[in-house]
Amino acid sequence: PDSFNYVHPFIMEDELTIYFASNIPGGYGGYDIYKATRAKKSAKFSNITNLGPNVNTPGQEVFPAMRDDSLLYFSSDGHVGMGGLDIFVSVLKNNQFQQAENMMVPINSCWDEIGMIYDETPSLDPKSKSPYLAKGFFSSNRPGGRGGDDIYYFVLRPLVYSIAGFVKDAATLQYIDGAEVEIIGSDGSSYKTLTDI
């Protein structure tokens, strides 16, 4: 019998791919994140694949969960974090998991955060009437809870910015009505508008 552990399984909705953590030999550290696949629901899982160094480290990677078939959430004490186990996200792009990024505050703390799961039920922010960017649950042993690991609910609301300014003619310093202004976001998004004085 194996003396290794296979823990924290997350099975995809189609039931053909499963993600899990294991300390089987050949990994990068203690526990690594792996996936296994099968051709049909009645078949056994096989093709066990380590998710590689963008996800796994010499430390512990545990509690995998996929969202939208392209976002892997997991906990790690091997990536640079805030302390203990932090929750990280890695994007699946061209069949390759990208470098994991820390979810930062308020999700992570200097304590342990594990078991990120999203609530995909559609709902609107009562203030802005916009859809929430995300909401879900995770567990943490941070202070202020009721015991060991407590379950926390989170809501990530859309960021709403208000920008004001003026466009002046460089020579006359007169305000220009109807000038086109373009705002470009760090993600490549853009918004165009006209000045109105």
Task: Say what each PLM segment does.
Residues 1-166, 170-180, 185, 190-194:
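Short, conserved micro-motifs composed of acidic
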